[in-house]
Every structure is written in C-alpha cells, then in structure tokens.
Amino acid sequence: MAKSSEIEHPVKAFGWAARDTTGLLSPFKFSRRATGEKDVRLKVLFCGVCHSDHHMIHNNWGFTTYPIVPGHEIVGVVTEVGSKVEKVKVGDNVGIGCLVGSCRSCESCCDNRESHCENTIDTYGSIYFDGTMTHGGYSDTMVADEHFILRWPKNLPLDSGAPLLCAGITTYSPLKYYGLDKPGTKIGVVGLGGLGHVAVKMAKAFGAQVTVIDISESKRKEALEKLGADSFLLNSDQEQMKGARSSLDGIIDTVPVNHPLAPLFDLLKPNGKLVMVGAPEKPFELPVFSLLKGRKLLGGTINGGIKETQEMLDFAAKHNITADVEVIPMDYVNTAMERLVKSDVRYRFVIDIANTMRTEESLGA
C-alpha cells in the first residue's frame, strides 16, 4: 500500500475515492491534464462497478496506491478533442475500458494486444507517462489518448452496455482466442455472476451449447429460462458432475475466489480447455494429473486489446447483448460494494454518474 501525492493539473475534476484499506469511498477533488493534441475529453455518463474495483480499493492484490478513484467500465459523451484527433468528434458517445496507455511499440502492442504490453497503463491505479496517478470513472470527467477511446454503437444502451467494457471483453476474448466460438461447441461457464452471465450471452450468440456450473441451485431457473443456457450443473452435486464428465469442449471460469479445479477438468473432453478469467486473491492449487489425462489445457486471459474490444462492442450491438444491471446513484456505491461481495446483485451495478454525481460537494480533498 502506498500514498500518492496529487499533482495539480489545469482541469478540475470530482469523483469518489478510497483513501485506505477500509475501501470506504467518499467525495474527492482532484485534477486532470489539459486536452493534448491526440486526447479526447468526455463527460462521464455511466460507470460499471467491477469486482476488481472492490479488490483494488481494499488493496487485496497488494499494489494499490491511495487515494484511488476506481472505475474502468466508462461510458460518456465527448466534450473536447485535440487538434489531431480523427477517431471521434464532440457530441459522440464513447467508452473507456480497462486501459488508457501502453508503449504502442512492443510486439504485443503492434499485434493489437495492448493488454499484454509490459508497460500497460490501467485506467486507474497506474502511473501515467507524465508521472501522475490514473483515476477512473467514478468521476465526472475523463481524458484519454484517442487510441484508447472506443466508439459506441448507436443501438447499444449506455447504461447496460457499460459493463461490457470489462465483463464483455473478458469473456469474448477467450472464446475467440481459444477457438470456442464455433457453432455447436459445448461450453461450460463457471459462476453465474457479473462475468458469467455475459459469458453465457456471448457463447450463445456464437452458437454454442452452454452449460452453467454454479454452487447455487437458485441460479438454475435463471440460467435456463432467462439467459438461455442449455443445461445447468450444481457443482456440489457429485452425481450431476459425474454424469457430465468428458462432455465439454471448453470452460470459462469466472469465479474470483479459490475453488477446486480438478472437478472442472473432469468435465472436459480430451484436448479440452479450461480458461480462467476470475482473479482470486491467492494462487490456486494445480491438479497436474487432471491436465495430463486427456491432454487438457489450462489457460487464462485479462480483458483484451483495443481493436478486439471495439469488435466485441460491435458484436454485442449486432446481437443485442447487454449486461443485466441495477443502476444506482453515486452515494449508494459503498452499499453496492457490500452487496457485491455477497453476490447480492443481478448481475452488475452501474453508477448513474451524470445525474447523481454532486460536484458541489465540499468534502474530501
């Protein structure tokens, strides 16, 4: 845990920040840089609440610098563009996802995989090129290089589309990369939560046969009837799990806490792939023999590059994919964090920044 010293920039900004490991978010005055020639400035309209926001404000991963303004599922309207910006114009709706910077010259960046760059700059909690701390979308305004700005499809809702900037790309990308996007592919989705319910929608749009695997029997009806999954497995029911052995081509595991992996490997066909997208606080135990039997693959992914994220947004708009959301006011965010940990949301919180961020607040500098 570290403390950052705020550098005064020309543009005043207002948001909600956590200041220590309690994770309590409160009003926070700060500043953002002036609009550079390749920069896009936007008024934030909506920002999704991601499980990683909770991890970061509590320093669960051990690298948080305070104060920290979370939020990397950001939708807004462009208010100013730099003199050399060509991608968008004032008045356009746009998105900012998990990244606001990378080296732009390494092999990963040149291959449109900015998220794999060793010098990636996260939307919040990272050091920007000018040495200042990045702050996220729990704020009234954002500025970013146009390369990291995403054009918002006209028919994609702003509020329920916002979580796609993390949950959408985090599930779309592995389905594409690991070859699990072919019609008829049998896909398992572990955990019917913020990531999981989007994974189901993405996989179904690709034409997959989807099995939801969850610890809660109460999720069965929603998985099958509302989200359109083809089957449901209660992973605490050994008979159900045994009956489904060697039935899946791939599994997208969205659970962000430690859990046994061996039962999931048993569900895979030979050459099957288990892809981890949840980020737990502690390392998993790896059941090596489960991998050896059947030449199975354990993989992982972390969001995606800018080109692929734009592709995902366009795909979502074409197939009418959005997140199931509960829109909340800014001052409800601490309660939302408490509910998030209890899985008491169906399935994603989205903060109505534009209508509920009271910038006249004088608290917390």
Swiss-Prot record:
Essential cofactor(s): Zn(2+)
Leading EC class: oxidoreductase
Keywords carried by this UniProt record: Cytoplasm, Metal-binding, NAD, Oxidoreductase, Zinc
Cofactor note: Binds 2 Zn(2+) ions per subunit.
Pfam family, one: ADH_N
EC identifiers of the protein: 1.1.1.255
Record: residues binding Zn(2+) 2: 103, 106, 109, 117
Protein residues bound to Zn(2+) 1: 50, 72, 166
An example Gene Ontology CC term for this record: cytoplasm
Molecular function in Gene Ontology: mannitol dehydrogenase activity; zinc ion binding
Residues in coiled coil: none
Catalytic activity, as annotated: D-mannitol + NAD(+) = D-mannose + NADH + H(+)
Record-linked CDD domains: CAD1 (cd05283)
Principal location listed in the UniProt entry: cytoplasm
Location in the cell: Cytoplasm
UniProt xrefs under InterPro entries: ADH-like_C (IPR013149), ADH-like_N (IPR013154), ADH_Zn_CS (IPR002328), CAD-like (IPR047109), GroES-like_sf (IPR011032), NAD(P)-bd_dom_sf (IPR036291), PKS_ER (IPR020843)
PANTHER family with a match to the protein in the record: ALDEHYDE REDUCTASE
UniProt function note: Oxidizes mannitol to mannose. Provides the initial step by which translocated mannitol is committed to central metabolism and, by regulating mannitol pool size, is important in regulating salt tolerance at the cellular level.
Family: Belongs to the zinc-containing alcohol dehydrogenase family.
Protein name: Mannitol dehydrogenase
Protein's gene: MTD
